[in-house]
């Protein structure tokens, strides 16, 4: 069994997910050298945990999600060899990744297994948590699209994960759709349900511009683990920027062990040059937050927009109306064709 990696001087443990969530923004094209330089900079700044995987987790390199330029297991190995103090985490989605992928990631130096399911499907993670704990890995559970169910129902799903061996259950705002009290209420519900059985975490996105504020709400509600990405390097408008989170946490007295100036330097000088472009709160990203669309849909929507000549923001809005979730990216093609037919019908009148 693995204990939770948590220094007594911390109030919360930060995880930087630039090299996993950022993979969506980079269309999974990280090189080994980019991973090496980013991990070295984050490690030197005192970031406790760095997540490294394909954007959609172990085994995500595929036609549906996009192929990795460099095999993710190779990137995990490079990250683990580079980090001096930071622990390397990896994400897996049951049905995308396999138990064998978990074992290989551990062999390559990953020590924290983060297992993600849709927020109503925690039961599909039970065997994976069991294996991870048997292997001696620390475990984290992701309840994705947490805005779509009530705090009470989310807490029930968190209990399933905790009973299966999960050591920290995250409220995951995959769409960046939660607003302040929505985060507080969900985190409080999980804290009340789990007690000392498991910690509670929060993973935010910037699609409504609330990633940092929501993370502060989460900490005040009892969250002990918080995600972010340097320079907002993530899906949609990006994740809560770690460097801003550390600045805010310093000001309100929340201890993280991360040096503000070092993480600001890492974001500016190391992470930013590896980004294809800044993560923007543009119309497309804003629509995702407003309509509750899974953040990784952004690049897929842009691709179908270009292919079929229909506006990406309309694709995303309809995806929200259909309540699509991660794994249903292919339905954007159906929506594009639907809009295309409507355009042609309107033009023929």
Curated annotation (Swiss-Prot):
Record: residues binding Mn(2+): 21, 203, 205
For this protein, the record's Gene3D superfamilies field holds: 1.10.8.60, Aldolase class I
Which residues are substrate-binding?
20-21, 174, 203, 294
Site, Transition state stabilizer: residue positions:
20
Molecular function (Gene Ontology), one example? 4-hydroxy-2-oxovalerate aldolase activity
Domain Pyruvate carboxyltransferase intervals: 12-264
EC number per UniProt:
4.1.3.39
Q: Does the keyword Lyase apply?
A: yes
* Coiled coil segments of this chain: none
Task: Name the keywords, alphabetized.
Answer: Aromatic hydrocarbons catabolism, Lyase, Manganese, Metal-binding
Q: Which PANTHER family match?
A: 2-ISOPROPYLMALATE SYNTHASE 1, CHLOROPLASTIC-RELATED, HOMOCITRATE SYNTHASE-RELATED
Family assignment from sequence similarity = Belongs to the 4-hydroxy-2-oxovalerate aldolase family.
The molecule here is called 4-hydroxy-2-oxovalerate aldolase 2
What is the name of the gene encoding this protein?
bphI-2
